Structures are given as structure tokens and as C-alpha cells.
């Protein structure tokens, strides 16, 4: 089992701000996460899967995973 990532580590891996990762989590649009007591943790595989789901081949392709 790979070590779990903190929110800061997940943000660093994704090259996003911690605040953006937090907003994505709260809105339900971010990677799957674990809530352990008061801590939020991410499995590396879930972060990578979330990122892979956002691959598009052109700018005209609609990203159906990112509704606002």
C-alpha cells in the first residue's frame, strides 16, 4: 500500500493551490479522498485517476467532468 497524501501533498502533485484542491473536494469535483478523524487524505491512485479522467484531445472537446 502506498502512503496516503495530505491535502498539501495532493495539491503539490497536481500543481494546484491547496485552496483549489479544498474547493474541489468541498464541491465534490475533486479526487476521491479519505476522512480519517479530522484529517483529509488522498490515495495516490485516486489522484492519478482523477487527473487521467481530465485528459482531452482538443480545446473544443467539452469536459463533462467539470460542471459549474
Where are these regions (language model features)?
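Polyanion-binding surface elements
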Residues: 1-23, 53
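Short amphipathic alpha-helix starts
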Residues: 10, 42-43, 47
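Intrinsically disordered and other compositionally biased segments
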Residues: 23-24, 39, 63, 67-68
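Short, flexible helix/strand-to-coil boundary loops that buttress conserved ligand/catalytic motifs
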Residues: 25, 37, 51-55
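Short, solvent-exposed alpha-helical "recognition" segments
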Residues: 27-34
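Short Lys/Arg-enriched helix C-cap and helix-to-coil transition segments
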Residues: 34-40
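A short, Lys/Arg-enriched interface patch at domain edges and termini
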Residues: 45-68
Amino acid at each position: 500500500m502506498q502512503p496516503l497524501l495530505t491535502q498539501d501533498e495532493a495539491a503539490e502533485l497536481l500543481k494546484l493551490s491547496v485552496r483549489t484542491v479544498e474547493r474541489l473536494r468541498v464541491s465534490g469535483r475533486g479526487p476521491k479522498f479519505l476522512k480519517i478523524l479530522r484529517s483529509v487524505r488522498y490515495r495516490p491512485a485516486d489522484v492519478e485517476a482523477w487527473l487521467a479522467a481530465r485528459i482531452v484531445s482538443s480545446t473544443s472537446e467539452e469536459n463533462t467532468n467539470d460542471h459549474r
